[in-house]
Amino acid sequence: MPSRRQFIGITGASALAAAAPTRLQAEAARSNNDSQTQGYRPVRTLNGWTLPYTLKDGVKEFHLRAEEIDHEFAPGTQAKCWGYNGSTPGPTIEVVEGDQVRILVTNALPEHTTIHWHGIILPSGMDGVGGLSQPQIRPGETYAYEFEVQQHGTHMYHPHADEMTQIAVGLMGMLVIHPKQPEAKPADRDYCFMLHLSLIHI
C-alpha cells in the first residue's frame, strides 16, 4: 500500500478490459438522461459529467472503473491522481427513488478498494466497508453493488478502503437521487459542483 509520497511515483495500473464508459462516450449517449424519457430534469455537473446506464431486466446498470489518471487542475498544471472512468471527481450517477440499480466496479488500481454510498439506505453487504460489510475489491477484480434506491437527495460516493489516501488523491463522485414524485415547481436548471482541495508542489 503506497504512502502519499510513494503515490506520486506510481506509473500506472494494470491494463484491463475497459467496460466503463468515458466522458466522451457518455456525452454521445446523453439521450439516456433526457428529461422527457426519464421523468426528471438531469443535473449538470459543472466540473464533471453524468454516467450513462443500460437497462437490463428492469435494473439500471452502471459501470465504474477505479484507475490512475492524469488530471489537469489548471492549464499547464497536471498531476497523477486516482479517479473513476478517467476523471476526478468521478462521473455523477443519476437515479430515481424506487429504482433497482446495479453498479459494477472494476479495480484497475495497484491496491484494494471499495465504494461506500454515503448516506444511502441499503443492505449492509452493499455499504462498501471493506473487510466488514464486503470483501475488498482487489486489483483486477470487479464487484457488483445492487440495491433498491429508497430515498431521494444529493449524496456522494467514495472508498471505505484506505480512504484518507484514496479520497485525497481523487476517488469520489456525486450520487443524485431524483424524487419519485416530481417537484411541484421544477427548477429551470439543476447543477452539481463537487469541491475538493488539493495541494500540489510544482
What function would you assign to each model-found segment?
Residues K60-E67, R189-L195:
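Short amphipathic
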Residues I200-I202:
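Conserved small/polar residues in nucleotide/adenosyl-binding loops
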Residues V176-C192:
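Low-complexity, Pro/Ser/Thr- and charge-rich linker/hinge segments at domain boundaries
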Residues E61-I177:
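Histidine- and aromatic-enriched segments that form or immediately flank copper-ligand environments
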Residues E163, P179-E183, L197:
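Short, well-ordered alpha-helical segments in soluble proteins
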Residues Y53-L55, T165-I167, P182-P186:
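A general structural signal for short secondary-structure junctions and capping/turn motifs
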Residues M1-A15:
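N-terminal secretory signal peptides and thylakoid transit peptides that target proteins
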Residues P21-E61:
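C-terminal segment of N-terminal export signals and the immediately downstream linker at the start
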